[in-house]
């Protein structure tokens, strides 16, 4: 950070010469000098070059108006105003709050001014650095000798080996030297929440509107388990979104709780539509509890917000309606909701405390903010027992955390403070909306087919767009009013072949083919559905990346319309099975997969597969205990009906479990099996198009798709721990009496 911008006024020698002297002295101090052409050029420079650390301008020419504009972009950026001896400053006390320092045009004073600018720059850097990151930088600069972990000793061990030196050179000196031991007392402790680590957590809590925040260094998968372990004692009942992330299934395998599921909707595209409002009512929960063996009134609830596809809930409704004392919003995909007004009322930390309730929000900082992979946060609003919570925290946290991950989490929060954070998110929203409009324009102008966007017809308003029951674009005919909202930065493109009402067209282009084409051209899709592709317009997306995506999509249309050979369009796919794809053309491939989808009537099958849940025979915890006891056996997927699954079965997409450990597929839930069989059939017919299904594998010898089930008898009464587990205190609730 060493760039100073000078707005040079060449109208008078007595102004030009002092600035020329200052230029020379600033270069001696290690600064680089930029000369913007005009006011707009300067503001663009400030907006686009984050390494700018100061602005110099002539007070007579630019004065307070420019100072205010600079402050709007970066209120902490040092501003240096030069005035001649006879200038009228005309400033009041509120103006002096702007970060302006005044100097007089005078020959021979350049060295002194350059020294003051260096001091102001150092102070600026010190001010913008958050507490732990600042302490870490300071420690690394001190170059202390250590005789403790980690064994690479600031990278010196790597330099003792040829391959180690390559590793060192790739990652760099500061990465090595900042990887330090928890024995460094001046940095405090992540596990004890002391020193700069505690300061960092408090800094994050203020930034994210939380009462308490925790830094998690191994992802939101772990953050979810920490919250769940604290909130759900063994034998208790929890209310959980059936579209939960698999980490919450793992929580239920670790902690012997009884799950009661909130059932979400799904449209013909396979897009998750959220949980209806009726599912959150007391009457609905009473009915679920009554129909679930060993269930009592839930002590904890988990809701995924937003959904993977970018749908937010009206969280105020959930907080005030759901009669559960502890509510956890798994918000892994939306760590930015506190930094733009369109998300108000749609996030866990929105608004004030809810009396008598604890609200948790877990966020993957690394997913859509600027942090290292695995950086995550837990935010809390409400009263918790911090000592007990910390036991759950320590249970899941390494005693050797990577300080780079911790500091990146805090730095991500620092980047989002004030106007700077709002501008970053606003930029993402604007780029996403421009991209959406460009797709619609190209669709209108294209000959024949082109991609469409899953969105309302009118997106001129910068907002989270509501899914109303009177609109058809979203494909959820019975959706509640004022309940679900589409995030503009989650862009879902639609490929030809399927209408919003679930009608399969005569011809279609499965999205998996487009996804493979984009991958060939260096563009990775976030999620690929049957006829839709999800793209995330995070703060790291710029105009170049958006234009590259547009270009690749138009190129795909061209090669598809030309009906080129698969080996020329998708060479990686061709190399997987050259004999199979030798003469095949791209349209034949697309229509072949589309015909399979039509044969199975995918929209109807997908609807039925998620309409009826498998039978709960035992809790996920009990099923896992049977597995570790060895009471399991392999089973062909086709023969799974009537058997208890040992593992979760999770096809990707959509990336949520269709069968939980301890559940049995029955005649009523047969569509779940048919759905899985269809996914496997497509992969068997077309090499390279296998669906990744957690819990299902293909036997190399027989070619059959296999699962793991519990041995017969393992689920008999008396053989499973749940028969002896203590129930949570309290009786089953009735409509007449609150529990």
UniProtKB/Swiss-Prot annotation:
Keyword list (alphabetical) reads: Cytoplasm, Decarboxylase, Lyase, Pyridoxal phosphate
Instruction: State what protein this is by name.
Output: Lysine decarboxylase
Question: Gene3D superfamilies given for it?
Answer: 3.40.50.2300, Aspartate Aminotransferase, domain 1, Orn/Lys/Arg decarboxylase, C-terminal domain, Type I PLP-dependent aspartate aminotransferase-like (Major domain)
Which residue intervals make up region (Disordered)?
714-739
What's this protein's family per the entry? Belongs to the Orn/Lys/Arg decarboxylase class-I family.
Q: Where is the composition biased (Basic and acidic residues)?
A: 714-726
| Cofactor(s) of this protein | pyridoxal 5'-phosphate
Tell me, what's a Pfam family for it? OKR_DC_1_N
> Which Enzyme Commission number(s) are listed?
4.1.1.18
Basic residues bias locations: 728-739
The primary location reported for this protein is cytoplasm
The record's Gene Ontology biological-process terms are: arginine catabolic process
The protein's location, in the record's own words, is: Cytoplasm
EC category name: lyase
- Name the Gene Ontology molecular function terms of this record: arginine decarboxylase activity; lysine decarboxylase activity; pyridoxal phosphate binding
